[in-house]
């Protein structure tokens, strides 16, 4: 019996040692995982962007074996912070992708799908239905609100739409303005609805989302013109990023399903639902050429001439 007891104690001790070694090995494995950062362009504000894309960052960490850190970045600071090497992966709107591709040879990973046009979207110029305005040429001397200047479908696409219709916004319009603060696209749509401006540059996706959420009725507006469809938000990677990791991240994005979840603050969260997206699609750099042509006509980065 004494021999059996000694054997049992020895076995238990050995098992404890093995468990401890396994735990230490696991800890070391986690500690030794590579660490990288993803810069996310702030959409409406930092808080909203954090809530939307923290689960996405966690998902990419789980799928690639890299500890990715979420980094919120102001649109106007994005290129400067990327150039400094603060982050190697990017999530931004499509004009920032074009700028970073032109200046820093950014690698295209995948394009975000959201709304009825999937990985593409468009800009529109809207007026109230009862405004009496039925075509772009009737905006002469009128007030119009645009989105931020680096908003592809809130500024660039609509400005270009006017130019292609023979209208110089600088001399043709009465005045134009950009709302202050967050949620600029929503504010523009409301400004048109409540008569604060005569017309607005509204992303078609915002009209779709606000209508679906019951905030507006599209029947209250007339779309005077719509731009061609252009790519929506885009994931990219710095040109010196390890190729195998680039492919891992691309595959993880393209494989993302509505049922995929991660744990955030002790709660299981659906990644796509949290990010307000419908998945990702693999576009080519050539698909971004319409943005390049718009930017050249509008005299915008990365092609502006002073």
Regions found by a protein language model. Name each.
Residues 94-104, 158, 163-164, 191-219:
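A ligand-binding cleft/hinge motif common to bilobed small-molecule-binding domains
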Residues 41-42, 122-133, 229-244:
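A bilobed periplasmic-binding-protein/Venus flytrap-type ligand-binding module shared by bacterial periplasmic
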Residues 36-39, 44-58, 237, 241-306:
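An extracytoplasmic/periplasmic, membrane-proximal ligand-sensing/linker region
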Residues 70-80, 169-190, 229:
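Short helix-initiation/N-cap motifs at beta->coil->alpha
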Residues 54-64, 116, 154-181, 208-216, ...:
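Ligand-binding cleft/hinge of the Venus flytrap
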Residues 106-118, 172-176, 211-229:
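Short beta-strand->loop
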Residues 31-98:
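Extracytoplasmic small-molecule ligand-binding "clamshell" domains
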Residues 33, 127-148:
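Flexible hinge/capping segments at coil-to-helix
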